[in-house]
Regions:
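Short beta-rich binding modules
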Residues: 1-106
Length: 106
């Protein structure tokens, strides 16, 4: 599924090209890369239709063990690179940014 898993693969994740997101909004995005995080999360790199490149961490839900935002059925651990989505990003009460919803862009 294109997830970087080995130490060497993780070291080559393009953090400099895809900095963590620091804004809210709804974006049409393409999944460009992904790597397992240090917790029960996957870090996904996206490129928005407007050219914005960013990463966001998606944590595993306890109820179904999917790496999915909110009530979305999309498990980003299983999605192939190049897949397009409409995603909503919000700022949490603790000041972090997260994906709150995702749908396939058709």
């Amino acid at each position: 599924y294109g997830v970087r898993t080995t130490v060497l693969e993780k070291e080559t994740y393009p953090y400099h090209e895809y900095p963590f997101l620091h804004q809210t909004g709804i974006f049409n995005v393409t999944l460009k890369d992904k790597v397992w995080g240090k917790s029960v999360n996957i870090i996904c790199a996206f490129e928005a239709d407007n050219g914005l490149k960013f990463s966001i961490s998606i944590f595993r839900r306890k109820r179904d063990e999917k790496y999915a935002p909110g009530s979305s059925a999309i498990d980003f651990a299983l999605e192939p690179l190049g897949t397009k989505f409409i995603c909503t990003f919000v700022k949490t009460t603790s000041g972090f940014y997260k994906m709150s919803d995702a749908e396939y862009l058709i």
